[in-house]
Amino acid sequence: MSLRTKVIAALTGATMLGGAITGVIQHNEGLSLTAYKDSAGIPTICYGETKGVKMGQRASLSDCQKQLIQSAGEHAKALDGLPMQLSDVALLGALDFTYNVGVAGFSGSKVKADLKRLDYAAAAKSVLAWRYISKYQQKSPGTGWVYKGSNRWTFDCSQYINGQRNKVCWGLWERRQWQSKAIGNQYKNVNAAVSALTKYGG
């Protein structure tokens, strides 16, 4: 049995882990029945779905719930290669992280490399490095953006602007903090991990 099989079984079998997976993604992504552009300018719908999404697109709640289970199962393929001993809490955090950064992003990350060694502390630290968003345009998108060359601008989502939490992507930073604790196996169980979401804005 692989971790991907475990996730799919949890999602389709309505288990505690399956409920936690969908609950975390729903909380962290939020729900939109109409397509919108996320903080990086990518068309998004339902619970953070970006694949094949076009502006103007609409979906029903039922469509979004089905899509979430299917998409979470597809994202679970990024867990291939991780040890079966990976805790459910770390698995929950890793799947939410993958849902946000994509299968390729997680698969090539230091986070996954750390989890392969079951080095939860290192993985927790590695997650926090994923706090930047990028935009490609000639002029600065605004305060706090840093030019990286070739019309690429980056924004550190953990930064304060004029003493206030930034309004660009602070929610992403809060999500990374929760993911860091989950991937770091710092919650007692999946229920405690889900309950901890209320501390963060999501």
Give the location of each predicted region:
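Structural recognition of the beta-strand scaffold that forms the well-ordered cores
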Residues: 44-46, 93-96, 122-126
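Active-site nucleophile-His-acid catalytic modules used for acyl/amide transfer and hydrolysis
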Residues: 74-112
